[in-house]
């Protein structure tokens, strides 16, 4: 049995400190050579996620990127990822390639239906990106919220551009948000 934890946004401020995960379990289904490989689908559940055929009525999200190892040690998920599934290493009786091991890793997931919290302004997703809105959560930290005001908290700032260094932000910038990636500084201004 493989154990998976799902998260729908990074906890912590500045655009991504770490995942807020909910542990869940799953059993390999045998649909692909690798458990939850790119373009395979998962079901949703309150206690488990399973690999299912993407044409199944149980399919809820598609894998858009898949990496071995821990999130903190690996590449960032694509910008419009809706949530991340964390896969714990297991040694089940049957697995994806017959070697007796499902390695630790993570799958970057995109929901099959709207809403997409990973879209710019969507109010969630594991990464803060250009077009997202944030609010102050205290102690110099910010959290993402929906730009349309439908989130738990109203938006205070919108990330309007991403740059390499703060000095490259427009003069109208009032808040700098840590984004990660090749342009790690988000330039934000009041909504």
Regions found by a protein language model. Give the residues of each.
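C-terminal motif of bacterial Sec signal peptides marking the signal peptidase cleavage site
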Residues: 3-6
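Primary mode marks residue(s) on the alpha4-beta5-alpha5 output face of response regulator receiver
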Residues: 8-191
